Amino acid sequence: MHKHFIIFLLLTISFSIGIKDVYAQKTDTLFHTNGNILTGEVKKFTKGLLYFKMDGMGTIKVENEEIKSLISNKFLRILTKHNKVYYGDIDSSNNWGEVEVGLLDERDVIKVNDIIEIFPINNTFWLRLNGRMDLGADYSKANSMLRINGSGQVNYQKEKWGWQFKYNNHDSWQQTDSLLHTAKTDFILSTEYLLSPKWRVTGTAGRSSNTELGLQARWYTVLSLQNYLVQTNRATLDYTMGLSASLERSTTGTLQNNYELVFGTDMDIFKYQSPDISITFFAQVLPNLKTKGRWRFDSGFDARIEIFSDFYLSGKVYYQYDSMPIGEDGQTTDYSFATGVGYSFN
């Protein structure tokens, strides 16, 4: 297991513990369709679920169909399926199933079912953080192979800007005549700017390695434009177009500069009726602008099912293809399947 993941794990646990109850002001009001009126704190609304924190009960999840109305005097970012974004507070209206949103001089009445996202723009650093982490391992005596995988991400959100750090690693050790070690590792730091509910500009910097492909390291930057084709409370689908610049080092020491086009798509499907289930898929095609005939394909599939509050089981698959690997002994393809246990925090 890489020491980087252990450091990431400890930092994430520290963040999640530190933000649990600090600065929490439970002054928001939720009107439930069953007639209950609940007082607590709006944590966020996403993927058809309102995360509402209450004293003694912790954070409950309420589906959008169960919300009659909602009141919060916090400064919020509210996105709707009609390609509108509002900034301000949220208040009840004269009609159930509708809310009043915006600032004092610019307010609209919208339907709760039209809301895609509510995100508090908190003044406190810790309350802007959310993320997850997972870890898995398996051993096969038949071929003397040990595999360990770990991943995690931390997100930080402001009014129109967002930042994300992601880490992934897949390591395997197999004892034959000698100990064979293969590894795939990714560090990714990205930032995005919200142009509208459907359009975002994204900048990414990262480092990746894959010994199976003969790649010791790839340092890269990407500038891209992202558009959401589908954005509902049950699924999202987007496509990305961009340009990447990178420096590669092979396992034999060869260095190479590259410029690539980036065409990608991401899809999320989610169901939040116990147990919570989410499925994520991404794929990217990267034609090389410098080396004629070279192109790469990168894809991943991630499924998670909740076992109890904030903890989940995960299954992950990745597949990578490089038509002309930089390493002389590199393979053109690499893929893996891994399972693990994870924890998420908001």
Could you describe each region identified by the protein language model?
Residues 23-157, 164-168, 186:
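Compositionally biased alpha-helical segments
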Residues 133-139, 152, 165-171, 191, ...:
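Transmembrane beta-barrel strands of outer-membrane/channel proteins
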Residues 159-165, 198-201, 232-237, 270-279, ...:
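Repeated loop/turn-to-beta-strand initiation elements of outer-membrane beta-barrel proteins
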Residues 7-16:
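Bacterial N-terminal signal peptides
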Residues 153-157, 190-192, 226-228, 264-270, ...:
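Transmembrane beta-barrel domains of outer membrane proteins
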Residues 333-346:
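Outer-membrane beta-barrel "beta-signal"
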Residues 136-142, 157, 170-176, 206-214, ...:
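Sequence/structural signature of outer-membrane beta-barrel proteins
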Residues 81, 111, 118, 123-130, ...:
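Outer-membrane pore/translocation modules
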